[in-house]
Amino acid sequence: SRLPAALRETIGRYFRDQVAVDPDHEFVVYPDRALRWTYKEFDERTDNLARGLLAIGMRPGDHLGVWARNIPDWLTFMYATAKIGVVMVTVNPVYKSHELDYVLKQSDMKALCVIDAYRDVDYLKIIRDLVPETLTQQRGYLESENYPFLKNIIYMGPEKHRAAIACRSSCCWEAMCERRW
């Protein structure tokens, strides 16, 4: 190929090479959370999440939305979706109800990952209002009249808020990351 080597390189391939070359080197650092992951730790975490996404029915080409501010989980979803060929749809963290409604209808999202809130935006309330089925349907079997592609809500947050989005109908982030097949 006539392309320079740097243009032929993918982020995934570069990341895998770094894991092989220097697995114990820090890759993710969030000082405000006292969080540090090495290449190896992050690789394992994203592999586990990728397996969890496959287990809930995500397939190459499917769209997964992430509605969150800049947090470690956002980065984890970015790499996990790339590993399995799922398209990550980033949702602006300051979007309100009408904007999320538009994105859900236009993006064919099969799953939406959310945190509880950001600034003055209560994500969980917006989800309950837009997708009331989350309050009555079982986890993993979401059938929404307004969003026919949407099958799962994945909540990334503290256990104390799980009931706010009816855990019966949402996939739990920690459970997905901890699964090992």
Task: Give the residues covered by each predicted segment.
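Structural core segment of the AMP-binding/adenylate-forming
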Residues: 56, 84-172
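A generic structural signal for well-ordered alpha-helical segments
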Residues: 18-19, 81, 104
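AMP-dependent adenylate-forming
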Residues: 14-38, 158-161
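Flexible, low-complexity linker/hinge segments
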Residues: 2-10, 164-181
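Conserved AMP-binding/adenylate-forming core of the ANL superfamily
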Residues: 27-79, 98-101, 169-175, 180
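Short, histidine-centered active-site or binding-site loop motifs used for metal coordination
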Residues: 1, 31-34, 108
